[in-house]
Amino acid sequence: MPKEKYDPPDPRRIYTIMSAEEVANGKKSHWDELEISGRVRSLSTSLWTLTHLTVLHLSDNNLSRIPPDIAKLHNLVYLDLSSNKLRSLPAELGNVVSLRELLLNNNLLRVLPFELGRLFRLQTLGLKGNPLSQDILSLYQEPDGMRKLLNYMLDNLSVHPEQLPHRPWITLKERDQILPSVSFTVMCYNVLCDKYATRQLYGYCPSWALNWEYRKKGIMDEIISCDADIISLQEVETEQYFTLFMPALEERGYDGFFSPKSRAKIMSDQEKKHVDGCAIFFRTEKFSLVQKHTVEFNQIAMANSEGSEAMLNRVMTKDNIGVSVLLEVHKDFSGAGMKPHHSSEKQLLMVANAHMHWDPEYSDVKLIQTMMFVSELKSIIEKAACRPGSPTPDPNSIPFVLCADLNSLLDSGVVEYLTNGGVADNHKDFKELRYNECLTNFNCNGKNGTPDGRITHGFQLRSAYENNLMPYTNYTFDFKGVIDYIFYSKTHMDVLGILGPLDPQWMMDNNITGCPHPHIPSDHFSLLTQLELHPPLLPIINGVHLPSRR
């Protein structure tokens, strides 16, 4: 796990006492360190109410036990219990995951609770002067012994075989009983590629639960239980697409399309097996593949750099990709009422999937990658919708579903751009870097568009998970937030329902500080929505769109 900067407490423990004048002037006292000394034998229960404490000195006393309530001091980074008479430690001490230093020297400890393995942020563990068992001492005395001991305890900590509670299905709208329509389900899921699932990043997870051979079963169980008509996956390893995902889903009636990140093109066959990418699967009894496309963001950045150093040095160097499939909705699935108003036409559906750059410091890159992808999708849709002799096609003429790990929060420029149809060309997420000339290439009307200071995309999109229906889609120790999305054409579709979040009380009861976890195979939660596709619209008559009828 990346270590944040940690400054140990000052051993001198200097303090100041407020003067009468300071008290009279309303100065507030603040203290977050506490020392208790004087050969104390027991601790007051009121100590466990001081949840603001970050440092607690309890050394050189006569304490024979520490109560489980120690876990209530969830802000502790330093705990000194040295030189007491402790014979055991409460398992609950392992829940104080904020700890950086835990000093247990010179006690009577023979064993340690395996729960201490959860203290993945520890930088110092003092165990000298204890009659510990030989297996503990042997590990502890090895080079990097503290880390090896903690890993051993975490890996051997028993995990209750408790079944994951079902996530609730949230109905948002009843299906239209008057006008004919068709409904289908869409899943979006970042499965956490094996090479990214390291102890350095996920130190709170046992190594066996990070192992791909263990996680892949939970991931496939999640995909199969959702039983979606369309499945969009990110961080799919190339080899796993061909040996796991495609064969397993093909057996269940799916076809699929996959592309790895751009770096795979310059790698050996052996190396490219481990490059991750994006995949889309669709149920063949409901859809047929018409077109498939891969969008390489670094190639588009190079072609549209317009002399911008930021475009070349920041955007072009990232090898993220997006994929899309143009599908035909089967007539026997859509029903007679869903037939297009031109009998020769097909009912088409565009589905796109992308994974944007991860680094929070590169908000400009994420926003431009999103613009490039949407601009390419607009071109694909316009070509597919174009008929000889017809005027310039409307990008909203074909229903569109966008699934993505955008690595961007709800208040980001990326989400604003997708939801509102555009953003200002001086949006703060561009970080005042020189992109203006490049951005016009991705504008709705191209370089000839009105220079109104906005970059627009022309689609009319809405998020399936509006109104904070999901408090987080990515859940790690350091970060919990919404970064995964399903967008859809609001002129063509409605959301009938979505899969809700996991019970937060269950997460709390099971001390799940981050994912992956033995019960949760990825650091992301899947999204699942049911969409209702409306009949195509006939030409406008007297200013009104009339739906096609039988």
UniProtKB/Swiss-Prot annotation:
CDD domains: Deadenylase_CCR4b. Substrate binds at residues 235, 271, 355, 360, 407, 474, 479. The active site is at residue 405. Its EC number is 3.1.13.4. Mg(2+) 2 binds at residue 405. It is found in: Cytoplasm; Nucleus. LRR repeats lie at residues 52-73, 75-96, 98-120, 121-143. GO terms for molecular function: 3'-5'-RNA exonuclease activity; metal ion binding; poly(A)-specific ribonuclease activity. GO terms for biological process: mRNA processing; regulation of translation; regulatory ncRNA-mediated gene silencing. Residues 153-550 are annotated as: Nuclease domain. GO terms for cellular component: CCR4-NOT complex; cytoplasm; nucleus. SMART domains: LRR_TYP. Binds 2 magnesium ions, but the ions interact each with only 1 or 2 residues. Mg(2+) 1 binds at residue 235. It is an enzyme of class 3 (hydrolase). Its main location: cytoplasm. Residues 1-148 are annotated as: Required for interaction with cnot1, cnot3 and cnot7. Keywords: Cytoplasm, Exonuclease, Hydrolase, Leucine-rich repeat, Magnesium, Metal-binding, mRNA processing, Nuclease, Nucleus, Repeat, RNA-mediated gene silencing, Transcription, Transcription regulation, Translation regulation. Signal peptide: none annotated. SUPFAM superfamilies: DNase I-like, L domain-like. Its cofactor is Mg(2+). The keyword Disulfide bond does not apply. Belongs to the CCR4/nocturin family. Component of the CCR4-NOT complex. PANTHER family: CARBON CATABOLITE REPRESSOR PROTEIN 4, CCR4-NOT TRANSCRIPTION COMPLEX SUBUNIT 6-LIKE. This is CCR4-NOT transcription complex subunit 6-like-A. It comes from Xenopus laevis (African clawed frog).
